[in-house]
Amino acid sequence: MTDSLGDILADLLDEIEAVEVSATREYARDGVPFAWRPEENVLELRLGVDIAEAAMRTPDAHVSERGGAWVRFTPGSWDEHARDRAQAWFRVAWRMAEGGG
C-alpha cells in the first residue's frame, strides 16, 4: 500500500492530540516545533541529536538545515517502509516536544 505524505500526516493528526499546525505546515506541541513539511513530499522532524544521527543511517534521511537534532526525510515513494519511519519519527518528535523539548 502506498500513501501520500498528506495521507500519513492526516492519519497521525487524527490519532495524536495537541498538535498545532501553522500556515507554513510546521507542526508544534505547546508552541514547540517538532516537524515541518517544507515541500509536498518532504518531512523534517526534530528527533534529538542522538536519534537523528541514527536515523541518518537509514535510506532517504538527510541532514536538515534546521540543525543536528533535525532529520530531513525525502523518500522517493511513500511505501510501507517510508510510512513506518515517518509515523514512528513523528510520534517520537511529538513526545520529545512535550514540556519544551
Task: Please provide the spans of the model-predicted regions.
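Charge-dense, helix-prone N-terminal extensions
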Residues: 1-101
